[in-house]
Amino acid sequence: ALVLSVQQLLCGCSATELEDRCFPMMAVVDEKDGQISFGYGFPKLSQKDNTDLEEARVNIAPVTGKTMESCVQTYDSRLEKLADCNHMKVLVFGENLMEDTGRYADVLSYLKQTGLFPRNIYVCVAEDPLALFETEEDLPQDLGSYLEQYLQNQESAGSGKLFKLGRLLDEKENHILQIMLPYLETEDHIIFWKNMYRVPDDRFLYKQEK
């Protein structure tokens, strides 16, 4: 309920309050040593108010915790500004999390109950989501925005169909569609989408070659 209240307040904020917020462009969620690992990816420059003012770049390492809720609370407590997720582009799940079906289901339940992230963001899987950040220095924009454009371009080129968070959360309950998520890999600091992950019924996950 607290998260929902914060999100509702953010929607009503005036432009003068932008300086009190930071804007994650992506989020990564994985499983590490039996716990949830969570973190945000931030832009280098403000992209929300048509100015070139530098964001307060928050270089906070991902945090771990027993639940997604505890991770979000811990991460937010370390930020100097309030995280406004309304402009987020991409959510990346780690392969370890996807193989831990219990925790994966718990994460989806938390996201559905809280509405923490926009329903229209793209969802993909990576063996090591943190490795994606190692490519950011060579990118023309922040990693989240880059991934959004890259995924859209690859979909247009026939690499596969993209899946948005809202649809994923709905299918968790409907169990109608065979869920296919882009699988991202890195090689020589370059990101590739070569494979798809299929989640038939949320009970197991495996990688399928194109």
Features from the language model and the residues they span:
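Membrane-proximal alpha-helical signals and transmembrane carboxylates
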Residues: 2-210
